[in-house]
Amino acid sequence: MAEADTERRPHIPVLLRPLLAAVAPVEGTWLDGTFGAGGYARGLLEAGADRVIGVDRDPLALEMASGWAGDYGDRLRLVAGTFSQLDSHAGAPLDGVVLDLGVSSMQLDLAERGFSFQKDGPLDMRMSQEGESAADLVNTASEETLADILYHYGEERASRRIARAIVEARAAAPITRTLALAEIVARCLPRPKPGQMHPATRSFQAIRIAVNAEFSELVEGLEAAERALRPGGRLAVVTFHSLEDRIVKRFLQLRSGGEGQGNRYAPETRADAPRFTLPLRRAISPDEAELAENPRARSARLRVGVRTDAPAGKVDPQALGTPLIPKKGRR
């Protein structure tokens, strides 16, 4: 039933219109590194792209696209993989790259994927359906590691209290369901007032980021885009929370020749020859009309860079303010 519900509910790509305006003219070959339900890929094709390569590590996303992808013939090619390797998926210099970060509405709406703290399902959260699940992490990580994950990846101030509660709960029985974990977290925090976010929001974000190695994937993906784009090619990134937006902002700032101001994770840094120019003075946020249509877009930010002809290079993740959590083992 969940799958049918998702098929009836149209996916709304966030900030699509301002993204297409910011990267215009849309032409040549583009790569959508987070294909999902295909909203950005279709938007790019309809805006004038000759060809789009859609990449996703979620096999369900590619399976669900099989019903309509053929309508575009050889203009749309789907690839199972991660955007951290997007340059290897491209095969030739690209005219543009689009990344829509974080968990998709499609994944949130399917309870069996285990991303939602509002729907009961197995505690999974894996985008690729491979490797360690959220249940594996929650039931085996040490209390100190859990606290670090919650604090650094979720900016959760009550991280130690929540980590302690998780360890105490799993001692009685393994934590295997999303609502069970959400209840454990909620008991550690004040009851939210009307309009405030669910108390488990930050904790679920943090665990999801850890399970999917989202920050290392993002840094490697930005580097891969730098390698793959031709001079004049566009990089457009849509973020949904402050941590990933900070990484993208700092990457574009440093790669455009600016100086990083530093933060609690990174020192001040001076960049080499500019690899990007910045056509937007600041990030673009959804307007009121888009928020009325899609409330989930509220935290979205769009940033755009235009590739120069300077050689691509490696970037120090710490220079981007990427939170690094030491491996402290299991319980």
From Swiss-Prot:
Q: Kind of enzyme, top EC level?
A: transferase
Keywords assigned by UniProt, alphabetized: Cytoplasm, Methyltransferase, rRNA processing, S-adenosyl-L-methionine, Transferase
Subcellular location(s): the record lists: Cytoplasm
| Residue segments, region Disordered | 287-331
Catalysed reactions, as listed in the record? cytidine(1402) in 16S rRNA + S-adenosyl-L-methionine = N(4)-methylcytidine(1402) in 16S rRNA + S-adenosyl-L-homocysteine + H(+)
EC numbers? 2.1.1.199
Instruction: List the InterPro entries hit by this protein, alphabetically.
Output: RsmH, SAM-dep_MeTrfase_MraW_recog, SAM-dependent_MTases_sf
Q: Does the keyword S-adenosyl-L-methionine apply?
A: yes
A GO term for molecular function: rRNA (cytosine-N4-)-methyltransferase activity
**Residues involved in S-adenosyl-L-methionine binding:** G38, G39, Y40, D56, F83, D100, Q107
Flavoprotein: is it a keyword of this entry? Answer: no
- List the Pfam families: Methyltransf_5 (PF01795)
Record-level GO cellular component terms: cytoplasm
Q: What is its main location?
A: cytoplasm
Biological processes per GO annotation: rRNA base methylation
Q: Which domain of life is it from?
A: Bacteria
- Please name the PANTHER family in this protein's record: 12S RRNA N4-METHYLCYTIDINE METHYLTRANSFERASE, S-ADENOSYL-METHYLTRANSFERASE MRAW
Described by its record, this protein's role is as follows: Specifically methylates the N4 position of cytidine in position 1402 (C1402) of 16S rRNA.
Q: Which family does it belong to?
A: Belongs to the methyltransferase superfamily. RsmH family.
* Name of this protein: Ribosomal RNA small subunit methyltransferase H
Its lineage opens with:
Bacteria, Pseudomonadati, Pseudomonadota, Alphaproteobacteria, Rhodobacterales
Gene from which the chain derives: rsmH
